[in-house]
């Protein structure tokens, strides 16, 4: 029987069906799963956090190479499947929880202080999970993630393209990102309508950038892209970085214009033309001017 056939048989045996609300697409080919684990560079001393255990296609080859695997799985039916089958190695611990609600700090304590992540992400949580990884980057050395290819392309996009945006900048300023492979729909059950990609995110190798205020950078980037078709003067003025908007709309715009020009940029630019380095520069000058305003 083919891997695809075994997957369908296992699901039927346990009266399971892929759940759309969880974005479940089960990996069916053993060779592909092993290639993904290789991309994650799993070693014998590694404690791995897996997001989305599914039927264990990645879990088993990972466990054979790692010291321990903590598998986070939201679907109660999948948890029961593994309990009944007893198919996972002894060095696998399942965590029945929504990954977006998991306390990464608490989990890291179980994993020696760091979370090395490998994930087959449900398409519906790709962006929220990326932002959660960014938030906890100090305890996540690397993450190997399978997601929609179009999302992977956004994370790797260049300035001036329609794919370039908030996730590109906020992830790109704190990690190196590489696309390792592309997976066709036939690799999954059920078959998605789009291609998937595996990327590696290495938070230990961020680009060389000057020191910057991380929280303020996030605010500047999100504000700049809040209305993509508008100029950075209009979007950043609307964010009221300097004064409460209702009382000081004109003053806010004047200060924003002054700050953008002081950073060396034309106020007529749209956000997608600014590079990561440009946004870091803009953030630094915004911080300087905001501090002067408060004095």
UniProtKB/Swiss-Prot annotation:
Molecular function as annotated in GO: 16S rRNA (adenine(1518)-N(6)/adenine(1519)-N(6))-dimethyltransferase activity; RNA binding
GO cellular component: cytosol
Main location per the UniProt record: cytoplasm
One Pfam family recorded for the sequence: RrnaAD
Organism: Desulfotalea psychrophila (strain LSv54 / DSM 12343)
Keywords recorded for this protein, A-Z: Cytoplasm, Methyltransferase, RNA-binding, rRNA processing, S-adenosyl-L-methionine, Transferase
Residues that hold S-adenosyl-L-methionine according to the record: 25, 27, 52, 73, 98, 120
Protein name: Ribosomal RNA small subunit methyltransferase A
Protein family: Belongs to the class I-like SAM-binding methyltransferase superfamily. rRNA adenine N(6)-methyltransferase family. RsmA subfamily.
Catalytic activity reported: adenosine(1518)/adenosine(1519) in 16S rRNA + 4 S-adenosyl-L-methionine = N(6)-dimethyladenosine(1518)/N(6)-dimethyladenosine(1519) in 16S rRNA + 4 S-adenosyl-L-homocysteine + 4 H(+)
The keyword Cytoplasm is annotated on this UniProt entry: yes
Protein's job: Specifically dimethylates two adjacent adenosines (A1518 and A1519) in the loop of a conserved hairpin near the 3'-end of 16S rRNA in the 30S particle. May play a critical role in biogenesis of 30S subunits.
Gene3D superfamilies: Ribosomal RNA adenine dimethylase-like, domain 2, Vaccinia Virus protein VP39
The enzyme's E.C. designation: 2.1.1.182
Cysteines joined through disulfide linkages: none
Enzyme superclass (EC): transferase
Compartment(s): Cytoplasm
InterPro entries xrefs: KsgA/Erm (IPR001737), rRNA_Ade_diMease-like_C (IPR023165), rRNA_Ade_Mease_Trfase_CS (IPR020596), rRNA_Ade_methylase_Trfase_N (IPR020598), rRNA_adenine_dimethylase (IPR011530), SAM-dependent_MTases_sf (IPR029063)
Origin superkingdom: Bacteria
